[in-house]
Amino acid sequence: MRLDTIINHDALCALRELPAESVHCCVTSPPYYALRDYGMDAQIGREDTPEQYIARLVEVFRELKRVLRPDGTFWLNIADTYCGTGSKGAYTDPKNPKGRNGQSLSLARRAAGCKQKDLIGIPWLLAFALRSDGWYLRSAIIWQKDNPMPESVRDRPSRCYENVFLLTKSKSYYYDAAAIAEPIAPTTAARYRGGRSAGHKYDGEVPGQGKVQGINRARTGGYYDEALMPTTRNKRDVWHINTVPYKGGHFAAFPPKLAETCILAGCPKGGVVLDPFFGSGTTGLAAKSLDRHYIGIELNYDYCTLARARIGGETN
């Protein structure tokens, strides 16, 4: 199997050519439903109904499950959309309101049981469909964007997040919590240093770590202080990651930090990271920077060319 390479092909067909249980991790963001037009035959995202869209993705990710190692992880970034007429000015791609190629989109968005202006619920419909297809649904992460795309709506809150689901092939899998651990809050550190009085909520223990001898005594420094006081905590499921402008021709690239976080947690060094919707190659760029191998699959030849130039050093 070739590594550090980009395959210009349909995702499903390309996945069928990969060996079983050959990749450690998948990080991907498939085309969102009815929000943009690649201008390509066989593209995903232009189906007549959400049900058809989800069925196609389930089929692709079923083949991904075959390719993924038993201890592998699958990180899926997906956003929602609204039911509407598809007229100009309706809900558009949160990453690029004018479409991938600068065109204004006018796509009908219809869903069974949904009224015009209803939020369809695409992320959770897909997550539940994947769970029914045998995936373990392990975490629903909120990618919180503190610099979101402005919206002109006045009858609902503006959107500022997308979903990232962690799915796995098995109930036991590779996950490096320490690699993405967060520093504890300054107030928490101060509380540890100062000790606690008897009867405190966490009397004699560090939250999440159980009883620790001497936790109620004030500590003034030295090796005792360092050994006793934790400096990090398990990463929470709300990730504050800003979008990053990209000057290339692919306007829907997610930020490298998002891909890096998933890869650090879900793929060992030297492992193989797969992205079946490679786009401009953010996943490959992140994998390479973290000493992991990558395999990218992308339907659009122009994006393959863009990704190769962006990543550099492709071996195949």
Identify what each model region corresponds to.
Residues M1-N316:
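Core catalytic lobe of class I
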